[in-house]
A protein has these predicted regions:
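Small-residue-rich helix-loop
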Residues: 200-212
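Rossmann-fold NAD(P) dinucleotide-binding segment
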Residues: 54-118
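Interdomain hinge/lid region at the active-site interface
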Residues: 215-251
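Mid-domain beta-loop-alpha active-site segment that forms a flexible
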Residues: 168-190, 194, 236-246
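Rossmann-fold dinucleotide-binding core
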Residues: 99-182
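NAD(P)+-binding Rossmann beta1-loop-alpha1 motif at the extreme N-terminus of oxidoreductases
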Residues: 1-67, 92-93, 97, 163
């Protein structure tokens, strides 16, 4: 566990991944967020540095995990000029966990190589609780030797991890996962909504769904919230639309 790990993007997912690695004995060397208050708060909690620049994260870290929002954010943090993770990046490994376009992962890998660094896709198919518990499902893309270099670290974050292939391939699979994931809740919501309109007992309907072809992972994770009309947001409609757009572009 000699690797020093920096984080860029410490929202709910990134922050919980940092907490998990800290608990596992890793040196979380720096955290950075476009919202400086988020980085400062997490740095205080973990006893680490709230980096004021992207370049500082690279300077203080061996492995940098990025958890940003979209393609534009990736282009910003891996900019060819100005403040950038690529500054002084020789020998570093970047693990990029955002759901972004496969082409951007390929582009970032090329930029990292030009800077003497390595880049790996670390696409996640799980949520906030799993990030904290180290039970993420990870789909990895990029050079196999790079994957092996950080495999132990990835194992602390995940209950299951799979190297899919070269750069871009893991992002393609993640786009398909999210496409299907975004379709399933709509079907379940329509079914439960109609059941409610018909005056059926929703607990009975859900139990029958669970034992038939209507069963799904979404029923397990979201069924009770739908029944109770609990609309607390864990994954925004804007993010779902962005992810579905990535899948649409693949066609």
């Amino acid at each position: 566990m000699s690797q020093k790990v920096g984080f860029v993007g410490v929202g709910r997912m990134g922050a919980n991944m940092a907490r998990r690695l800290k608990d596992c004995g890793y040196d979380v060397s720096a955290v950075y967020d476009i919202r400086s208050e988020a980085a400062t708060e997490l740095a205080t909690e973990l006893g680490t540095t709230a980096a004021s620049t992207l370049a500082q994260v690279t300077e203080l870290s061996d492995v940098i995990i990025t958890v940003v929002i979209d393609d534009a954010s990736m282009h910003t943090i891996f900019a060819s000029e100005g403040d950038s993770l690529l500054t002084g990046a020789e020998g570093r490994v970047f693990i990029n966990c955002a759901t972004i376009s496969p082409a951007v992962h390929i582009e970032v890998e090329a930029l990292a190589k030009a800077a003497g660094a390595e880049s790996l896709e670390g696409c996640m198919a799980s949520s906030i609780t799993q990030a904290r518990d180290g039970t993420l499902y990870l789909m990895l893309g990029g050079d196999k030797a790079t994957y092996e270099k950080v495999e132990e670290l990835l194992g602390k974050l995940s209950v299951n991890k799979r190297h899919i292939g070269e750069a871009g391939k893991a992002a393609q699979v993640k786009a398909l996962v999210n496409m299907v994931m975004n379709i399933n809740p709509a079907g379940l919501a329509e079914g439960l909504g109609l059941a409610d309109a018909l005056g059926l007992d929703l607990n009975t309907v859900m139990e029958i769904f669970s034992q038939t072809g209507a069963n799904s992972r979404v029923l397990e994770t979201d069924g009770e919230d739908m029944r109770d009309r609990d609309h607390e947001c864990y994954f925004s409609g804007a993010h779902a639309a962005k992810d579905s757009g990535i899948a649409l572009a693949l066609g």
